[in-house]
Swiss-Prot record:
Its EC number is 1.14.14.178. It is an enzyme of class 1 (oxidoreductase). This is Steroid (22S)-hydroxylase. The lineage of its organism: Eukaryota, Viridiplantae, Streptophyta, Embryophyta, Tracheophyta. Involved in reduction steps of the biosynthesis of plant campesterol-derivative steroids, ending to castasterone (CS) but missing brassinolide (BL). Catalyzes the conversion of campesterol (CR) to (22S)-22-hydroxycampesterol (22-OHCR, 22-hydroxyCR) and of campestanol (CN) to 6-deoxycathasterone (6-deoxoCT).
Length: 507
């Protein structure tokens, strides 16, 4: 009996590879037939797909699309594909059949039809890092609810009364700690990141800059960010794995803040404070704990990362355009003189609204630097546009950078020219071709705060410092925009009596 069982086992082991091969062949054949049937059905429904190429199996053309390139260009991949196929072409990116759009009209059409023909669809790895309740990945009613909370917290009234003074206070805290010895050399990108992180940590959770807990959170956040832009390989030691660990640590800090407030409320029989977003979300919404945690983490990411890079880009572009710096300084000197005549030492909302050329500089920085390069969307209904058929189920990437750098829309698009926005002579801001914060129902909720941060920081920067690059550096896309060397600058303090420093403001 034992010999018979051994013989059967031996025969099974002998045939096992053939059985597995047969099963694998059956599986791959079935999958291939399903794909062929689906593509045949798509071609029947959508016979006029955009031109393009699929690239390698599984990976498609993803590596080429994400190849590092200067932030002030669309990169070699996009340039070659646009030249070969036009501004609308098909590809295979991030594991999906994809239509890539460098067409201004189609990009507007996509953003205007959010929830009708298209919906937000980021790679799963992004949701794994930011959380399933992150505003970046939510769609439909959950997204609208989260966005409404953010918009209410960032209302115009709050911008004027609370956030403007907070932005100025944090600006002065950063600039006062710049080395007093002149000239001094340091990373402008690091300083911009420190400024925006401390500002967001204060307004999200009332965490003060310089505190040990705040600094620990900032270091955890740096590790977290490295995972956001890494390959989603969840193995010990990988950037993604470390980011998930940092995410858990950051959420633990937020959760402890929530518990402390609930205990304080129960102990003192008082309501939850609303001085920050955490208190606002706990009192003004019916969100669960998990939803609040993901909301705060995603806003820390969105409010810190993009704003800090935009500010670093402004410092970089201005360094190469002395004429713009001079006009900027003249505008802010006039604002400072009016402050002194009023007997005031802090910026008012009226001062901010008078920063007209500053807004031109901000617009041009966002156009040329393109902090947000493209958006992830999915087609939810068959779309017919400019003679092309785009099937439902496909991904579509509206490339905002390609529109901002389009020579048919902007004269000499690779040149930093803030005067193109002055008086809006070209009408570009109202044309729908300028979309640095997205558009439609998913327009960035913090766009006004981001512009306020840049304007206030530039006000105090140009009044008190001159700067130049300490060594050559340039913004690259990796796929997020970053300065390889951290944008090292050499800074000189301004000491003229007429341009008296305002860093002595009592804060």
């Amino acid at each position: 009996m034992a010999a018979m069982m051994a013989s059967i086992t031996s025969e099974l082991l002998f045939f096992l590879p053939y059985i597995l091969l047969a099963l694998l062949t059956f599986y791959t054949t079935t999958v291939a037939k399903c794909h062929r049937w689906r593509r045949t059905e798509e071609k029947r429904r959508c016979p006029n797909l955009p031109p393009g190429a699929i690239g390698w199996p599984f990976i498609g053309e993803t590596f080429g699309y994400l190849r590092a390139h200067p932030a002030t260009s669309v990169g070699r991949f996009m340039e070659e594909h646009i030249a070969r196929y036009g501004k609308i072409y098909r590809s295979s990116l991030f594991g999906d059949r994809t239509v890539v759009s460098a067409d201004a009209g189609l990009n507007r059409y996509i953003l205007q039809n959010e929830g009708k023909l298209f919906e937000c669809s980021y790679p799963r790895s992004i949701g794994g890092i930011l959380g399933k309740w992150s505003m970046l990945v939510l769609v439909g009613d959950p997204h609208r609810e989260m966005r409404a909370i953010s918009l209410n917290f960032l209302s115009s009234l709050r911008l004027r009364a609370v956030l403007l003074p907070e932005v100025e206070r944090h600006t002065l805290l950063v600039l006062r700690h710049w080395p007093s010895a002149s000239p001094a050399v340091f990373s402008a990108q690091h300083e911009a990141k420190k400024f925006t992180f401390n500002l967001m940590a204060k307004n999200i959770m009332s965490m003060d800059p310089g505190e040990e807990e705040t600094e620990r959170l900032r270091l955890e956040y740096i590790t977290f960010m490295k995972g956001v832009v890494s390959a989603p390989l969840n193995f010990p030691g990988t950037a993604y794995w470390k980011a998930l660990k940092s995410r858990a640590t950051i959420l633990g800090v937020i959760e402890r803040k929530m518990e402390d407030r609930l205990q304080k409320m129960n102990k003192e029989d008082s309501s939850i404070e609303e001085d920050d977003l955490l208190g606002w979300a706990m009192k003004q919404s019916n969100l669960s704990k998990e939803q609040i945690l993901d909301l705060l983490l995603s806003l820390l990411f969105a409010g810190h990362e993009t704003s800090s890079m935009a500010l670093a880009l402004a410092i970089f572009f201005l360094e190469g355009c002395p004429k713009a710096v001079q006009e900027l300084r003249e505008e802010h000197l006039e604002i400072a003189r009016r402050q002194r005549l009023r007997g005031e030492c802090k910026l008012s909302w009226e001062d901010y609204k008078d920063m007209v050329f500053t807004q031109c500089v901000i617009n041009e920085t966002l156009r040329l630097g393109n902090v947000v390069r493209f958006l992830h969307r999915k087609v939810i209904r068959d779309v017919h546009y400019k003679g092309y058929d785009i099937p439902s189920g496909w991904k579509i990437l509206p490339v905002l950078a390609a529109v901002h750098l389009d020579s048919s829309l902007y004269e000499d698009p690779s040149r930093f020219n803030p005067w193109r926005w002055k008086g809006n002579a070209s009408g570009v801001a109202q044309s729908g071709n300028f979309m640095p914060y997205g558009g439609g129902t998913r327009l960035c909720a913090g766009s006004e705060l981001a512009k306020l941060e840049m304007a206030i920081f530039l006000h105090h920067l140009v009044l008190n410092f001159r700067w130049e690059l300490a060594e050559p550096d340039q913004a690259f896309v990796y796929p997020f925009v970053d300065f390889p060397k951290g944008l090292p600058i050499r800074v000189h303090r301004i000491a003229q009596e007429e341009e008296k420093s305002v860093l002595t403001v009592d804060i």
